[in-house]
């Protein structure tokens, strides 16, 4: 699990954020996307991975993962990063099916992400392209939260997800997959 000091500081900060809201959410959704590049305004959404969390922790059994169907092969260098090859993309789920399914799974839960504006922008474009209505609207950016909680680390230029994971001793089995 997360170190106790991180959990305590996150709870304090999140409680303050949601104090202004009508009710504190019971379910949060941690979201990550994989794309065909680094431009959220231009590049294609390849995969969405998400897992629910609540006051008791991460709920692995309450998760969502989808690889989207694409008709054209992606860039080989990009595939080397995220591992979603041409076969997986060709066998993926159509955007018009995936985005409504994701919306139904998220429901009214706020979304959490690292550099969440990227994921939010990519998902908004995908929802629009799928004719699936509005993408999830409530987001918390953990990169901004981490910088607010530890400005000294942010000022030193230690701003990547890997930097923050190292600070808190959090190990991850895989990176650069939407679910990992």
What positions do the PLM features span?
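Short alpha-helix plus adjacent loop in nuclease-associated cores
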Residues: 140-156
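Short, Lys/Arg-enriched N-terminal segments with co-localized hydrophobic residues
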Residues: 1-4
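Acidic, divalent-metal-coordinating active-site segment for phosphoryl/phosphodiester hydrolysis
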Residues: 180
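Conserved non-catalytic scaffold segment of RNase H-like nuclease domains
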Residues: 7-31, 35-124, 128-129, 134-136, ...
């Amino acid at each position: 699990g997360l170190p106790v000091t991180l959990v305590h500081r996150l709870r304090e900060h999140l409680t303050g954020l949601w104090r202004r809201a009508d009710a504190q959410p019971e379910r949060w959704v941690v979201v990550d996307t994989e794309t065909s590049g680094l431009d959220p305004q231009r590049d294609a959404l390849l995969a969405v991975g998400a897992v629910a969390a609540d006051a008791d922790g991460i709920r692995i059994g309450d998760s969502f993962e989808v690889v989207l169907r694409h008709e054209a092969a992606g860039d080989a260098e990009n595939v080397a990063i995220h591992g979603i090859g041409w076969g997986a993309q060709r066998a993926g789920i159509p955007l018009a099916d995936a985005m409504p399914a994701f919306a139904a799974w998220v429901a009214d839960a706020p979304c959490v992400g690292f550099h969440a504006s990227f994921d939010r922008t990519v998902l908004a474009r995908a929802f629009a392209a799928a004719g699936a209505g509005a993408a999830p609207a409530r987001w918390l950016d953990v990169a901004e939260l981490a910088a607010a909680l530890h400005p000294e680390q942010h000022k030193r230029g230690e701003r990547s997800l890997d930097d923050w994971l190292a600070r808190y001793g959090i190990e991850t089995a895989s990176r650069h997959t939407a679910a990992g």
